[in-house]
Regions:
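A structural signal for well-ordered alpha-helical segments within the folded catalytic domains
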Residues: 60-65, 93, 109, 151-155
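Broad structural signal for hydrophobic residues in well-ordered alpha-helices, predominantly aliphatic
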Residues: 24, 114-115, 131
Length: 245
């Protein structure tokens, strides 16, 4: 017998899909997108899309989980200065500072150099061995100087982050990353992730991924052109409460 809560969840998922398709129909009908939960995708653009250029998501798909795995192994402490590990950095710079207060290529380069120094392996190999292969992200990898991944692999990654599984990333790392780490400073940040309305966390501008541990729900949007206001309207459609009838 179908429980009332199951019917409500199904109705909510259907409502989210209708809202998203309505938003994209006029703004970017060819955008690649999906929304789902820890059990997998609930709706999205056409299945079977080949790997896409997701280089802008490299920090969250490769660097952030690799750093998390090093923390779990106690090979890295977030508040220890990078110079203590033999890595060149400004005095007092820590991995925590780079993840929560710094943005852009310089911070990502410093963290990549740290991970590669601690392990003796390039980031591409670390991410594949520690994260992508364990999650079954067989289509994800670096090629032609950038990161490529099919939508199905993005769904696997985001769904895992909302699941109770402890491998390849620990719940502690995910939970600690999705809380404010900047105190009263603005803009507020977690560990790489940015807080957003409706209890969501996001990374990226074009493309963008979102997580809501509370719902639990994830979403991603890979637009065909700079999204402008579409990024906000897509998030609203995916995560704003469904109006009561």
């Amino acid at each position: 017998m179908t429980l009332q809560s199951d019917r409500a969840d199904a109705a909510d998922a259907a409502g989210v899909e209708v809202r998203i398709r309505g938003v994209l129909q006029g703004a970017d009908p060819d955008a690649v997108w999906a929304v789902g939960g820890p059990d997998g995708p609930h709706a999205g653009s056409a299945d079977g899309t080949p790997p896409l250029d997701v280089g802008a998501l490299m920090p969250v798909l490769a660097l952030w989980p690799v750093i998390g795995s090093l923390v779990a192994e106690e090979a890295l402490r977030l508040h220890t200065p990078l110079t203590a590990y033999g890595v060149e950095a400004a005095a007092g710079t820590t991995a925590h500072h780079l993840l929560s207060h710094s943005t852009g290529p310089a911070a990502h380069t410093s963290l990549t150099r740290l991970a590669e120094h601690l392990t003796g392996s390039p980031l591409a190999e670390l991410a594949a061995a520690r994260v992508w292969h364990p999650l079954g992200m067989t289509g994800t990898g670096f090629a032609d100087g950038t990161l490529h991944a099919p939508p199905a692999d993005l769904a696997r990654f985001l769904g895992y982050l909302l699941s109770p599984a402890e491998h390849p990333l620990t719940r502690a790392w995910i939970t600690e990353s999705l809380r404010i780490r900047t105190g009263e400073l603005t803009p507020a940040r977690g560990l790489l992730w940015h807080p957003a309305p409706y209890g969501t966390w996001s990374y990226g501008e074009t493309p963008t991924v979102w997580l809501s541990p509370r719902l639990p729900r994830w979403a991603f949007l890979l637009p065909t052109h700079p999204p402008g206001p579409l990024r906000t309207t897509f998030r609203e459609a995916a995560f704003a409460p469904t109006p009561s009838l």
